[in-house]
Amino acid sequence: MDQCGTVERELEKVLHKFGGYGQLCERSLEELIDYAGGLRREILQAAEQDGELSGTLSLVLTQCCKRIKDTVQKLASDHKDIHSSVSRVGKAIDKNFDADISSVGIDGCWQTDSQRILSEVMVEHFFRQGMLDVAEELCQEASLSIDASQKEPFVELNRILEALKVRVLRPALEWAVSNREMLMAQNSSLEFKLHRLYFISLLMGGTVNQQEALQYAKNFQPFAENHQKDIQVLMGSLVYLRQGIENSPYVHLLDANQWADICDIFTRDACSLLGLSVESPLSVSFSAGCVALPALINIKAVIEQRQCSGVWNQKDELPIEVDLGKKCWYHSIFACPILRQQTTENNPPMKLVCGHIISRDALNKMFNGSKLKCPYCPMEQSPGDAKQIFF
């Protein structure tokens, strides 16, 4: 993080200089335009009177040309100074970051199967971003066969999201209504929030939309049990239509951030409904790699320095634990209290009849004949009664 801070400080200096340079350019050019415009008017007036320029005007014209030339040279000199600041950012990056990260790579990630998986993940990412042409081009270049059924959900989601970004609610409302039962099954408030936003947009029209707003309020009826207080607030705002919601105690209803929130809520609930992760797997992998890379580079350097390369030869395990933060926690971690090992897909946690939990490997090792005695209580039971659990 110290390295990032160093580069960020250099970058802030450059941005500050860019801002100052832009203001200087604008001010200098405006002054030159005003000066040259005034001189042009004087020349035109002199031409109308006697048709010839006086010695004084000729001198002023010469001074004007010199002033323009000096200003251009000054701006060019300042621009060169900015270039040196930009180059310092590049030097700071080279100094604080390792340009060669190939040392922490694994040869297996470039095998045919791995490349195919990576291409599929990239295609899905482009589908999620609405970049359908790029995704289809990548499919052709990577010789991937993507079924149309995989693409269609992303096309619809992107169409609805683009509409929400320009504050058009109708496509999202139609989608939410058609999927109401499934959304309610997962306790989603998406449809209510969409109706709420549409109602607020009617309120912004003032008394002209009062009757329409009252009629539209009937859409809140299915959500009265879970959103009673919110509905009361919305109905109370009708009292202030004449003076304007922006001048009332309900001004918070006009908060622009709720449009960004509804995009996030729609993305989350729609992806959940389709069995997709909210974030693109490519984005998650990239973010995790950015967090882990500095630690991996450091441990690799230590391993090479101490000549103990055999430490890093496990296919599915790193030599150190890398904390990716809670954002990257996708499942609970259970450590078997008997073997003192974390459970895996091949060695999952098993719940005994008595309620105690151990790993499958521990269960197999403790199995004796047809009975199994729990290591924590006196209950004896059959190993076949143990059930795999999911946290």
From Swiss-Prot:
EC number: 2.3.2.27
Catalytic activity: S-ubiquitinyl-[E2 ubiquitin-conjugating enzyme]-L-cysteine + [acceptor protein]-L-lysine = [E2 ubiquitin-conjugating enzyme]-L-cysteine + N(6)-ubiquitinyl-[acceptor protein]-L-lysine
Cellular localisation: Nucleus, Nucleoplasm; Cytoplasm
Major enzyme class: transferase
GO MF entry, a single one: ubiquitin protein ligase activity
Entries under SUPFAM superfamilies matching the protein: RING/U-box
InterPro entries in alphabetical order: CRA_dom (IPR013144), CTLH/CRA (IPR024964), CTLH_C (IPR006595), Fyv10_fam (IPR045098), LisH (IPR006594), RMD5A_dRING (IPR037680), ZF_RING_GID (IPR044063), Znf-RING_euk (IPR027370)
CC annotations in GO: cytoplasm; cytosol; GID complex; nucleoplasm; nucleus; ubiquitin ligase complex
Quaternary organization: Identified in the CTLH complex that contains at least RANBP9, MKLN1, MAEA, RMND5A, GID8 and ARMC8.
Descriptive protein name: E3 ubiquitin-protein ligase RMND5A
Organism: Xenopus laevis (African clawed frog)
